[in-house]
Design a protein with these regions (language model features):
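Short, flexible, mixed-charge acidic loops at enzyme active sites
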Residues: 1, 93-102
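Catalytic loop of short-chain dehydrogenase/reductase
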Residues: 1-7, 23, 27-74, 86-90
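Short secondary-structure boundary micro-motifs
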Residues: 6-7, 39, 96, 112-114
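Aromatic/hydrophobic pocket-lining residues that form the small-molecule binding cavity
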Residues: 14
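A short, exposed helix-loop element centered on a Lys and neighboring polar residues
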Residues: 18-19
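C-terminal helical subdomain
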Residues: 75-82, 98-150
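Short active-site-adjacent structural elements
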Residues: 89-92, 147-148
């Protein structure tokens, strides 16, 4: 897959999809970019070493798409980032738990609750139709642990 696989997937592919889709999107359309709190806050809050490369690549994708907001606004296309905490039942959480036993329980304790896949999917769907927050970011799950450190 190559050393730069995460960056190609989480930044370059996202930009390529936007480039291909934008001419087809009409005013009132919306781009929803899904990321993790660990990636969204990676510049100010360290994450597990096992996830750092992925987190940095996802943040690079977020930044690349955010840089396009003026262009999207000009054609009436909305943009929102959905930043979610660790999601129980995903392969990412399962793999992180394998290399860092206790990671899920630790994050659940810090956050008070972790969303499952269905709950998180419902939040992503809401982001596609709800008003766009002023900062273009919808947080799903607790962020206190990230903003206190940031």
């Amino acid at each position: 897959l190559g050393e730069d696989y995460a960056m190609r997937l989480n930044r370059d592919a996202q930009v390529n999809v936007l480039d291909a889709a934008l001419p087809l999107l009409g005013a009132g359309s919306r781009i929803v970019f899904v990321t993790s709190h660990q990636a969204h806050f990676i510049e100010t809050v360290p994450t597990m070493p096992e996830y750092e490369a992925v987190a940095r690549s996802k943040r690079a994708g977020e930044d690349a798409l955010r840089a396009r907001i003026p262009e999207l606004d000009a054609v009436g296309v909305g943009f929102v980032v959905v930043s979610g905490d660790m999601i129980e039942g995903t392969i990412t959480a399962t793999l992180l738990e394998r290399v860092n036993p206790g990671a899920i329980a630790s994050r659940r304790e810090a956050a008070g609750k972790l969303y499952n896949v269905a709950e998180f999917a419902a939040e992503v769907a809401r982001a596609a139709v709800d008003d766009i927050p002023a900062d273009h970011t919808r947080y799903v799950g607790d962020v206190d642990d990230f903003t206190r450190k940031g």
